[in-house]
Amino acid sequence: VPAASVIASRADRPITGETRPDLRNVAIVAHVDHGKTTLVDAMLRQSGAFAERAELVDRVMDSGELEREKGITILAKNTAIRRQTEDGPVTINVIDTPGHADFGGEVERGLAMVDGVVLLVDASEGPLPQTRFVLRKTLQAGLPVVLVVNKVDRPDARIAEVVEETHDLLLDLAGDIEDMDDAALDTMLSLPVVYASARAGKASLTQPADGGVPDSENLDPLFETLLTHVPAPHVDSTGPLRALVTNLDASNFLGRIALIRIHAGKLRKGQTVAWMREDGTTQSVRISELLVTEALTRVPAQEAGAGELVAIAGIPDITIGDTLADLENPEALPRITVDQPAISMTIGVNTSPMAGRGGGDKVTARLVKARLDQELIGNVSIKVLPTERPDTWEVQGRGELALAILVEQMRREGFELTVGKPQVVTRTIDGKLHEPFERLSIDSPEEHLGAITQLLASRKGRMEHMGGHGTGRIKLDYVLPARGLIGFRTDFLTETRGTGIANHVFEGYFPWAGEIRTRHSGSLVADRSGPITAYAMIQLADRGTFFVEPGAEVYEGMVVGENPRAEDLDINITKEKKLTNMRQSSADVMETLARPRKMDLEEALEFCSVDECVEVAPNAVRVRKTILDANARGKERSKMKSRDNAAG
């Protein structure tokens, strides 16, 4: 990647002799679950951001319901930590970016706002693929890095090895970046290392023993390292205003709020500025409200200067990447660029016979489209495209997780939807079909090596590296088509009995790898509507695993279970027992039935086969056939077969 074509290169920032020593803008980047949000909590507590007697909430920056539930950060958020130094107070603006590559658009936006990066790595797991993704973006932007080895008090910590692995990763990534001179390379590799335990709220510059606690009372060594190694923002405080919109938010009182970094000049409440849009047009607008961040809250301010991260209101249609400039002398800043989507799925209104009965109040195409348009405003890494049907849209994103999170958020908001199976977004390069590939990193007990190898061979995976810690666990690196990862998680957890860890990150576009069969079982499909009977389920118990319980309503074409054989089976699950004068307790009947397999949204999307989709409602997630009528399905299958034979 040429260092010139970076996200928000340091070359785009004002190069003047003037700096703001009272400011530091830092992003914390790490892999999912390496303790990033916990570290920010500890930094806030030790800077006195919470009142002594205030009730402390863990992981305060994960404010979204889904974020707390899944333990991952989805949106890039910022907080301001005030720190007293010998030279006076310093405000450290911390951007908490997602550690998951699926939310990469958030990572790129975060990097456009900062002058340095804290790379947080788990003392046992070391740098993982997602760390690689974020670090590559950081190096492209030419930002200095501070390495924080977190969780050093883990019993399985291997601190020295992890530091060495991080250095190797940096060297490897530096090789990918063109025109990087030796001085820049030396600076990058001589990065400072801080050893920390975020949960204990301690950090040290001296390496503790593996599993030991850092030898200081607090996080002061981390704060001092940040102030020394992250440069104060270079600013042009006397020049004309130039500010870049890096994120959006909404408020019930103020409407749309734009989060901006001021690169030059000053911004005042009530000021009229030039709003420079993506289409090249410029419009004069008034800043109705100016807000600055103090700890986790935004407070009104009258004025903000160059180098600061602030929020503004008063421009209803402003979007990410726009520039706010001086009216007399408008000059646009380079827009934020994000990687193209790799996975797509269709999202439309609920078209099943149970539509409107799933506890949702948002069931029309107009509402679905309005919600998807709203998502586009704040989420730069997704695209919404029309399909042949007026009530269905194709949504493209970075990965399966990002799209599943969007659908889950809509479900909780009261939407009833029909969601198609995730597909890959292909490209034609030099006349040949190319598809996205992913780099997959696996950590698993050694005894599952054979099963994992077999699983990935069937998904066109190519092993690139294999190693072990000498602890009975192995580390594998694979490169495989993104298609091969759709539905992979469930199979992988089954094969490793829940003990394996798998993480993946986008690698690039390569030639189409051929057919991949990710599911080797069929579906049990209801052939008529009605309530499920225990009698029918007992008669059909040997046919496979059920997803439903007696008494629930089904409709024709609904998938009620999994057939171990590789074909679909239409069954009558509503059949009633012929009445006799023999009596049987219903409790006895229930005991003979196996417990049904419950699937959440992600599992249902993974289970889906090509001719199936998922019905999503606030109180239910069901897999169903796209074509509900069994006869119509049979005709479509015959048509496909004859088409394949003709092509062959």
Give residue spans per PLM region.
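Conserved structured catalytic cores and adjacent interaction surfaces
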Residues: 21-38, 101, 124-136, 142-155, ...
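Acidic, low-complexity intrinsically disordered tails
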Residues: 1-16, 622, 628-648
